[in-house]
Design a protein with these regions (language model features):
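An internal, acidic/charged active-site-proximal segment
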Residues: 149-262
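Active-site-proximal, Lys/Arg-enriched surface segment
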Residues: 8-11, 44-142, 244-254
Length: 262
């Protein structure tokens, strides 16, 4: 635990944009060799779940206490994935592989792939407080097959889709979260699948998400609705953005049943 505490203290005080183990150990007075920190993370005797479980319980307990103190019961649950880019020559970290880069692919004729790791994260926002509640590492099916070639049968990995990992985290939150909160779940179009949407609705949670344009609403593709509604007046909706300024949006309201969600 000594090296874990050293790393935690260094992470708190470090102002470096890119934090490496060697860089963190340079901040520590009379620090041991940085390889000790790497070995602690690589061959630690505890599992990720053993560390995550008490953190999740602490976060929910703190969130409930803050809700009672501030009388704020509207909880925003945001779900998103993040791509952490690595050097093109990085090969020996198990989770590193080439992933589709949504950001760099925008506006390009061909998809762009970046060497790195992908993780999914669930964040909670209640009033002025924000929590990094939980996260999961995502491995491509190709990556799982490659890693399993070098593993014993009892230690082999199982491929899981992003939507499956997302639901796993939301199910854990649902089990810990007491009644009384009005919950809004936010995610992008990648997670707008039947299973995840129905799970959220069964809990009485609201969902705010993007939908891919080829999905159907009231038996018509979303991409066709702007033309159909072109004669309908826009509604002006004002929202307070992060810098507390009001921003006006022009929207049209449409109700119907969504179909063709994979």
């Amino acid at each position: 635990w000594q090296h874990v505490l050293l790393l935690a203290d260094a992470l708190v005080v470090s102002e470096a944009r890119h934090k490496t183990i060697a860089g963190l150990y340079r901040l520590i007075v009379e620090a041991p060799d940085p390889s000790n920190g790497a070995d602690t993370l690589r061959i630690s005797p505890w599992t990720a779940e053993e560390l995550r479980t008490p953190i999740r319980h602490f976060i929910v307990a703190d969130l409930v206490a803050y809700a009672r103190q501030s009388n704020q019961w509207t909880l925003y649950v945001s779900l998103d994935d993040s791509l952490g880019a690595k050097d093109k020559g990085t090969r020996h970290l198990e989770a590193v592989d080439y992933h589709h880069d949504h950001t760099k692919s925008q506006g390009q004729k061909k998809p762009y792939y970046t060497n790195g790791t992908v993780h999914l994260e669930v964040r909670l926002q209640l009033g002025a407080r924000s929590y990094a509640y939980d996260w999961r590492l995502y491995l491509r099916e190709k990556t799982v097959r490659r890693l399993n070639r070098q593993r014993a049968p009892e230690h082999r990995l199982h491929f899981r889709k992003k939507t499956s990992l997302a639901r796993d985290m939301l199910e854990g939150l649902q089990q810990l979260l007491p009644a009384g909160f009005q919950v809004y779940v936010l995610f992008d179009s990648w997670y707008a699948a039947n299973g995840l949407l129905k799970f959220c609705r069964r809990q009485g949670w609201h969902v705010i998400c993007a939908i891919k344009s080829n999905r159907k609403l009231a038996d018509k593709q979303l991409s066709q609705w702007p033309q159909t509604l072109r004669h309908q007046r826009y509604q002006r909706v004002q929202l307070t953005v992060t810098d507390q300024r009001l921003r006006t949006y022009l929207v049209r309201t449409l109700r119907g049943k969504l179909t063709k969600l994979s």
